[in-house]
Amino acid sequence: MAKAVFTTDGSYKPLFDHIKKAGGADLAEKICAESNAAYERLVNSDHTNLNNTAKMHWKQCCERAAIYTTVRKYYPESVLEWINESLEKFGLNAAAALNRIMRFPGMKALFLPIMRSMAKSMFGSKGGFRNQFGLVTKQEVHFDILECPYCKYMKELDCPELGPGFCKSDEYSYGNLRDFTFERTQTLAIGGEKCDFCMRRNSSIVGKTT
């Protein structure tokens, strides 16, 4: 039996807390089980021959679509708000974890090179993206995503309204770093020509090796 993707106390805990308050713990467990079953159906319904990098993105889209379409049957007016609340909490927790990591010697200097490497490997052609790099220095990294599989997959899964949530996750996590500034002016999911991405090391720490 496949490991459950969703638990009531996992990354979607805020959503399930709302369900518990509205309908009780038993209903929350029922919806959780239905969401896991929906995920298994979706993830195996298409794109079964993807490489591991692209498969990771497909799985994330299926996960989001599964819980959204399941909860929507019960709480159509609230589901999107509850999902976005869960995404915000998860992103802020990720930012807090990154801020703790930045306290270790040398990590601030390594962060931008790591971001650039991740953008090329995880968010490059192997993952189904088309991106274009701009300015890359020790102080800042700029790149644009011109084609995004999240937009494609969410349309295929008939949930295009979930696309912007993936973009907001960047803002929650990278936009709340203590030592770096995240800048973005547009995204593909909200009708932009690209997803622009700029991560800049704050001036107060430029030149430091820590």
Predicted regions and their residues:
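N-terminal, charged low-complexity regulatory/assembly segments
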Residues: M1-V71
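Amphipathic interaction/junction segments at domain boundaries or subunit interfaces
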Residues: K59, E63-A65, T69-L157
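Short, well-structured alpha-helical interface segments that form or flank functional binding sites
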Residues: C62, A66, S169, G192
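Short, hydrophobic/π-rich interface segment
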Residues: Q132-A189
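Short loop/turn segments at secondary-structure transitions that flank enzyme active sites
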Residues: P149, S203-I205
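C-terminal edge-of-domain segments
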Residues: L188-N202
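Short, charged, solvent-exposed linker or helix-capping segments at domain edges/interfaces
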Residues: G207-T210
